[in-house]
Structure formats: C-alpha cells, structure tokens
Amino acid sequence: MAIILRSSDPLLSRIHPEPQEIDHFDNLPDSILLLIFNNIGDVKALGRCSVVSKRFHSLIPQVENVFVRVDCVISDDDSSSLLSDKPRSASAASPFSAIFRLVFKPLQALGQFLKRSGSSSLPSGSSPSSLLISGGDDGEIEQGGVTHHSPTQVLKNFDEIKFLKIELPSGELGIDDGVLLKWRAEFGSTLENCVILGASSVIPPTNSDKTEASSAPVAAVEDNGSIPESFYTNGGLKLRVVWTISSLIAASARHYLLQPIIAEHKTLDSLVLTDVDGQGVLCMNRDQLEELRVKPLSASSASKRTLVPALNMRLWYAPSLELPDGTVLKGATLVAIRPSESKKEVCDVSWVSSAFDEPYGVAAKMLVKRRTYCLEMNSF
C-alpha cells in the first residue's frame, strides 16, 4: 500500500536537506594563516600542518620564521649499518655521548648535517656524523621504526625564510660537571667578534642568600681587579686558553658549515645556530649574511672550518664573583675577542656586557668593570 504525503501533512514541513558543513579556515585570509604558521615556527609542526589540506600545503613554503630542532646524531658508520639492516652493538647504538665528548667529533657532525644529498663524499678514512630530524617525508635513514632526514632536506621546502634558528642537541665542548662555559660569536665572511664567559665552578644561592640579595645591594669588589699570581702557576691561565681556542674552533666550524644554507636562502635576515645546553650561539644578521655570499671565506687547511684571523683579546678575571641573586662564580673569566684589523672603537664594551642572557649578563657587566688584560693570538 502506497503512502502519499499531502502538502497539509505536518511531517512534510520538517523534511529539509542537510546544510553543508562550513570550513571556517576557508574564511580566513592567507595573511592570517601565515601569521599563525610563523608563530608556530617549528619545522616538524609545520610539516604536519602541510598535510592537512592543499591550501595549507601551498602556504607552508611561504613561512618566514622557521625553527629546526636537531633530534639525534648518527655517525656514518651507524648509518651504514642501519641501511644494511646489520645488527649493531650497544655502543654503536648510542653514539651521542661519544660524539660530543670531544670538540672535533661534533664539528664533523655539523659537516654531514649541512651536506645536501647527492653531494660529493668526504675523503676516505673520515668518519663524520649526521644530525637528523625524526619524521617527515623523504627520510634517508630508518632507526627503530622512525624515519630520519637532515635539516637541509627540510629547509629546501621553504622559499621565503627570513628568520632561521637551528638548535643542536648538545654543545660541542665537553666540560666537567659544574664548570660554566658559554660563548657567543658573530660572523660575516669571517669572525667579527666573540665573547666567552667561563667559571671553574658555579655555587647556586641558598634561601638565605636569596633573601639577603633581595634586600641589599651587591657589595663592591674589595680587590683592585688584578689577577693573582697563583692564576699563572696553578694552570688557571692555561685552562682559559683552552676554553678560548675550543670555543673559537666550535664557532668557526658552525660558520663554515652553514654556507650551503646561506647560499640557497637569499631571503634570510637572521640566522642563529645554538644548542639545547645554551653553551654556544652563532649569530648572523642580514648584512653579515650578504657579506658571506659576496666575499668568499678563508677556510682552514687543517679542518672544515672558517680560518680564524689574527685576534686581539681582552680578558677580565675574578677569583670569586657574587651575582645579585646570590649565585657565586668561582674563577669567573670574561674574554672579548675581535680581529686585529677591526676598526671599531677599542674602549666600547657594550657589545661585551650585552652578549649573554641573565643571570650571566650581569656577570659580564660586573667583570668588565675590573682591570683589563690584553692578549693577542695568531691566525689559525
């Protein structure tokens, strides 16, 4: 028996087509989406966003602010065993600690990190390492079910990067527990300046120290800022020289091996290469980046790093330095470095005292008020 719905039937008035779903992202202009993507910055998160829709995929390459976090370090030997599916020993499975024990291993790691696929191989006998990011497309190495690829492979998908920050999983310099060592360097086609802050030990403030520090100003330095004789005889000066040379080697290696990225991404206004530990920071602004593209750098014949020019150095030292928050730096040392040919004002120390974030910024400001010692270093 057929059922006929008449126009007077109340059921008929309630039958209507289902409205189409509204995608509110379609109502947002591209400029707003790009603002969101630029605030995200992280290259992994942006990669996930790019697979959401064709529109997102077309906008991601226009992102100007990119942050690349390096997840792991895998030596070439380990990479070969991974690709061939051969069993690996426990020590080979954990190259991270061994690679970052000495200065030169991570320098090789940076070299492999910044090499593009298909580029010429390194000389035989060398055993460089790769800095890799997990996840994403076009991976090169699979480890433990996770696909890895180099940051340069990721960056080639971006066309308009202006602000790029790369973070290594650890500082290059192996230092003892409790030792403070931080450096910040600026480069053009060569080293423009470098500031190094070190201390043989750091004593954190106690609760009583914090209370006293909040209620009283920092006491004035009682000595005249002179370096004690024991500094020269107990190995203190030698240790500071090692810190200085090691920091300069690490900085010059980072600079040398950033060349491919700098050459390819001509829209860059700022490039920062740092590490999770906050040990070292290499910075380049737009003028410095352009200088490197125009003026070829001088490479060291001994290793893959930029040649460090002849240097003038100023050193400040305090056997014990108490900061406003109660922290005490034992054997506090500040070294300000510029090329010997630098024409900038010698007495200007503003770039030195502003090199580090707090609480170490105030340490630099306190140290530059002490007696200055001048040193020179040949090119290396």
From Swiss-Prot:
<dbReference type="Pfam" id="PF12937">
    <property type="entry name" value="F-box-like"/>
</dbReference>
<dbReference type="InterPro" id="IPR044809">
    <property type="entry name" value="AUF1-like"/>
</dbReference>
<protein>
    <recommendedName>
        <fullName>F-box protein At4g18380</fullName>
    </recommendedName>
</protein>
<feature type="domain" description="F-box">
    <location>
        <begin position="22"/>
        <end position="70"/>
    </location>
</feature>
<dbReference type="InterPro" id="IPR036047">
    <property type="entry name" value="F-box-like_dom_sf"/>
</dbReference>
<dbReference type="InterPro" id="IPR001810">
    <property type="entry name" value="F-box_dom"/>
</dbReference>
